[in-house]
């Protein structure tokens, strides 16, 4: 079996401006933040992003990397809850927003994973969701009669096809098999299966034998057929949680949100945390924690 290990920047070097990317995780939980920071270091722009959003989306918006977003929500999960950079991009019109129900996003990923053009869903009917889609979102009439007679109209959720997807898990092997050791898979497997290029980071790369002995079978969420490249990235989800390896860094998340409130504060944040390598970032975060 091939060894799929690579480096963060080498993985991101495969992106091109204008691509559609999926960012797995959920809000401020197990986000592939090391990959996000690598995208910030790149020249890639004009991205369409598909996400259950958190600071991953906020950071990309802060750097002007995003053109359009398909999202079920955007949340930091704890105070101040709403990501400041996404809020600015959304309200200023800097991005095209395709807001939807969480189930609709999952349905779109499922359609893409199954290589279907769309899947029917009731979510979104009777709501203002279609108004956010600029005519993209269509309905379909069921060819089968409903139990009470008549033919039901449903949302035809389009496949959310991804040029590339990024996910972060706790444990993996060099071939791309991986497991989560926390409490929730966060649909990470769907993001990977919906994509043409699949990139995974993990807290630790271990031997396959150790991987399968470390977790119950149902936690082996990702297999090697879903992954093109894997990166060992300790702290790769920071400042989101990657429990049980570490929780959300609440102090740093507040620091991020507060820094975004002024131009000077944000320039200092970028200089301190986002202008160097991933190793530089982790060292700066260590210094931040030591000073508190």
From Swiss-Prot:
InterPro entries per the UniProt record, alphabetical: CoA_trans_fam_I (IPR004165), NagB/RpiA_transferase-like (IPR037171)
GO biological process entries: biological process involved in interaction with host; cholesterol catabolic process
GO molecular function, one term: CoA-transferase activity
Pfam families associated with the record: CoA_trans
Annotated SMART domains: CoA_trans
Phenotype when the gene is knocked out: IpdAB double deletion mutant does not grow on cholesterol, but grows as the wild-type on glycerol. In the presence of cholesterol, ipdAB double deletion mutant accumulates COCHEA-CoA. Double mutant does not survive in macrophages and displays severely depleted CoASH levels that correlate with a cholesterol-dependent toxicity.
Keyword terms of this UniProt record: Cholesterol metabolism, Lipid metabolism, Lyase, Steroid metabolism, Sterol metabolism
Reactions accelerated catalytically: (3E)-2-(2-carboxylatoethyl)-3-methyl-6-oxocyclohex-1-ene-1-carboxyl-CoA + H2O = 6-methyl-3,7-dioxodecanedioyl-CoA
SUPFAM superfamilies per the UniProt record, alphabetical: NagB/RpiA/CoA transferase-like
Signal peptide: none
Pathway field: Steroid metabolism; cholesterol degradation
EC number: 4.1.99.-
Subunit structure as annotated in this protein's UniProt entry: Heterotetramer composed of 2 IpdA subunits and 2 IpdB subunits.
Family: Belongs to the 3-oxoacid CoA-transferase subunit A family.
Record's function text: Involved in the final steps of cholesterol and steroid degradation. Opens the last steroid ring of cholesterol by catalyzing the hydrolysis of (3E)-2-(2-carboxylatoethyl)-3-methyl-6-oxocyclohex-1-ene-1-carboxyl-CoA (COCHEA-CoA) to 6-methyl-3,7-dioxodecanedioyl-CoA (MeDODA-CoA).
Name the record gives this protein: Cholesterol ring-cleaving hydrolase IpdA subunit
Taxon lineage: Bacteria, Bacillati, Actinomycetota, Actinomycetes, Mycobacteriales
């Amino acid at each position: 079996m091939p060894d799929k290990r690579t480096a963060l920047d080498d993985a991101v070097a495969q992106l091109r401006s204008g691509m559609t990317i999926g960012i797995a995780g959920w809000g401020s939980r197990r986000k592939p933040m090391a990959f996000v920071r690598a995208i910030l270091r790149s020249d890639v722009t004009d991205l369409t992003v598909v996400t259950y959003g958190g600071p991953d989306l906020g950071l990309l918006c802060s750097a002007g990397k995003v053109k359009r977003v398909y999202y079920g929500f955007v949340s930091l999960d704890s105070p101040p809850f709403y990501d400041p950079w996404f809020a600015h991009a959304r309200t200023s019109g800097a991005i095209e927003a395709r807001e939807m129900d969480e189930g609709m996003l999952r349905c779109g990923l499922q359609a893409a994973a199954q290589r279907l053009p769309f899947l029917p869903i009731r979510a979104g009917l009777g709501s203002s969701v279609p108004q956010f889609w600029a005519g993209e979102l269509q309905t379909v009439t069921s060819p089968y009669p409903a139990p009470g007679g008549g033919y039901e109209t449903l949302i035809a959720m389009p496949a959310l096809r991804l040029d590339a997807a990024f996910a972060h898990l706790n444990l993996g092997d060099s071939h791309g098999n991986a497991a989560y050791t926390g409490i929730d898979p966060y649909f990470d497997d769907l993001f990977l299966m919906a994509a043409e290029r699949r990139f995974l980071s993990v807290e630790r790369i271990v031997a396959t034998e150790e991987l399968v002995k470390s977790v119950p079978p149902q936690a082996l969420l990702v297999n090697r057929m879903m992954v093109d490249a894997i990166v060992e990235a300790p702290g790769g989800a920071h400042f989101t949680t990657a429990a049980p390896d570490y929780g959300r860094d609440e102090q740093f998340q507040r620091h991020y949100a507060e820094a975004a409130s002024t131009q000077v504060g944000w320039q200092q944040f970028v200089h301190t945390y986002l202008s160097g390598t991933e190793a530089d970032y982790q060292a700066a975060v260590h210094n931040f924690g030591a000073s508190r």
